[in-house]
Swiss-Prot record:
Catalytic activity: D-serine = pyruvate + NH4(+)
Enzyme Commission number(s) of this protein: 4.3.1.18
InterPro entries in the cross-refs: D_Ser_am_lyase (IPR011780), Ser/Thr_Dehydratase (IPR050147), Ser/Thr_deHydtase_PyrdxlP-BS (IPR000634), TrpB-like_PALP (IPR001926), TrpB-like_PALP_sf (IPR036052)
Disulfide bond residue pairs: none
Record flagged with keyword Metal-binding: no
Matching CDD domains: D-Ser-dehyd
Species of provenance: Bacillus thuringiensis (strain Al Hakam)
GO molecular-function terms, A-Z: D-serine ammonia-lyase activity; hydro-lyase activity; pyridoxal phosphate binding
Alphabetized NCBIfam families for the sequence: D_Ser_am_lyase, PRK02991.1
Top EC group: lyase
Protein's name according to its UniProt entry: Probable D-serine dehydratase
Cofactor(s) recorded in Swiss-Prot or TrEMBL: pyridoxal 5'-phosphate
């Protein structure tokens, strides 16, 4: 790896990142959609295939998870206008947010209460389908609800699934795998919250805890799975299936925007702010949105100041060859879902030509935003899910991106969507603790 001093000279923004300051990075490598898609390893066909698979499984999902009955087994979340929060942001940051502000509540996705219910559940279902088809338990024409049987559960019990996680991915993989009948092991890093471990164990999931961070948990999970031919490892750092499961969100969002009569075109740009850990969730969603809205959607990743792995990987072009620890950042943050020191090389390289930018936000800011959203809209998210909330303020305030893309006039007719990635499953006492922290920090700031 290039000497750190050389990197600092080449990329002056690194100095601020090393000081854990909040920064906004505009991606100089973003290309026009038509150019970017030509070199992409994934296509619209891949996303369509994932969408169809989720449809095939809908009857099974509706049967085993009654909370999805209303949506006929489609796992989807609300898209809400948050005008009171918008006013509060404008007042607190003394910055008008140009355009409308909405919250995509993946925090309230059924089954596992986070964005990971998209990719994680999809990858487990795809694996289950492949096994069932190979062994004649199922044909693609069948009603997939037949998988809810003792025979099928006994069949899946011969196989195991493993994953490394800081929390939410473990929840979605664990809950789904256990429901189908798989033996499932979740390798959890030191920053994983206790309640997430407890919940998984209550569902019959084997949880292995590590003193080290996320990358170590993934590495160990991968190593153990490699030694067992009947074990399938969900590889959060490299998985195309996870990525495609997330990408399906875009066409669902398109339908919701149409229902709200919100136009997205050249004169009405869409800005989307996505909390980013290793990169799969935000990368997949952003990729799906680019397929639909091309150059009229502008996607930004949001990371904690203590774990800006994707920003560093993208900015230096080193991707997964550099970790935040290499430049002296500790990767310690209360935003547990984003506490990742080394980004996914696959996601970084795939998203590099599509991504508008990436910014960092401090833990203190996340807690203040958590309290503000609860006070103004009565919506409770976990700290990491608030990383997107400051995005519209940043992009409007530091308007380098808007200037560069000639959006200064258009942004007022545009729409900002903050992706709320998790929170509905947080136990009440834990959420109260988060709120109190936000309250204390708000008083301190004033």
């Amino acid at each position: 790896m290039k000497e750190i001093e050389k990197l600092k000279e080449e990329y002056p923004l690194l100095n601020k990142l090393i000081e854990t300051e909040e920064v906004l990075w505009v991606n100089p490598n973003m290309e026009k959609y038509e150019t970017a898609i030509k070199d992409s390893p994934l296509s619209e066909e891949n996303v369509k295939d994932a969408k169809e698979r989720l449809k095939r499984f809908a009857s099974y999902i509706a049967k085993v998870f009654p909370e999805t009955k209303e949506t006929k087994g489609i796992i989807e979340s609300p898209l809400l206008k948050i005008p009171s929060m918008k006013q509060a942001l404008e007042k607190n940051y003394e910055q008008p947010i140009l355009g409308e502000l909405l919250l995509k509540c993946d925090s309230h996705l059924p089954i596992s209460g986070s964005i990971k219910a998209r990719g994680g559940i999809y990858e487990v279902l795809k694996h289950a389908e492949q096994l069932a088809l190979q062994h004649g338990m199922l044909t693609e024409e069948d009603d997939y609800s037949i998988l809810d049987s003792d025979t099928c559960r006994e069949f899946f019990a011969k196989y195991s699934i493993a994953v490394g996680s800081t929390g939410n991915l473990g929840l979605s993989i664990g809950i789904m795998s256990a429901k189908l009948g798989f033996n499932v092991t979740v390798h959890m890093s030191a920053d994983a919250k206790q309640w997430k471990k407890d919940l998984l164990r209550s569902k019959g999931v084997n949880v292995i805890e590590y003193e080290a961070d996320y990358s170590k948990a993934v590495e160990e999970g991968r190593r153990q799975a490699d030694a067992d031919p009947s074990c399938y490892f969900v590889d959060d750092e490299n998985s195309h299936d996870l990525f495609l499961g997330y990408a399906v969100a875009a066409s669902r969002l398109q339908k919701q925007l149409e229902e709200l009569e919100i136009i997205v075109d050249e004169e009405h740009p869409l800005f989307v702010y996505l909390p980013c850990g290793v990169g799969g969730g935000p990368g997949g969603v952003a990729f799906g949105l680019k397929l639909l809205y091309k150059d009229n959607v502008h996607c930004f990743f949001a990371e904690p100041t203590h774990s800006p792995c994707m920003l560093i990987g993208l900015m230096t072009g080193l991707h997964d060859k550099i970790a935040v620890q290499d430049i002296g950042i500790d990767n310690v943050t209360d935003a547990d879902g984003l506490a990742v020191g080394r980004p996914s090389g696959f996601v970084g390289k795939t998203m590099e030509p599509f991504l508008s930018g990436d910014y960092t936000v401090s833990d203190e800011e996340l807690y203040r935003l958590l309290k503000e959203l609860a006070d103004t809209e009565n919506i409770y998210l976990e700290p990491s899910a608030l990383a997107g909330m400051i995005g519209p303020v940043r992009v409007c305030k530091e308007d380098a991106y808007l200037q560069k893309q000639q959006l200064m006039e258009k942004v007022q007719k545009g729409t900002h969507i903050v992706w709320g990635t998790g929170g509905s499953m947080v136990p009440e006492d834990v959420m109260n603790g988060y709120y109190k922290t936000g309250e204390a920090l708000t008083i301190l700031e004033k």
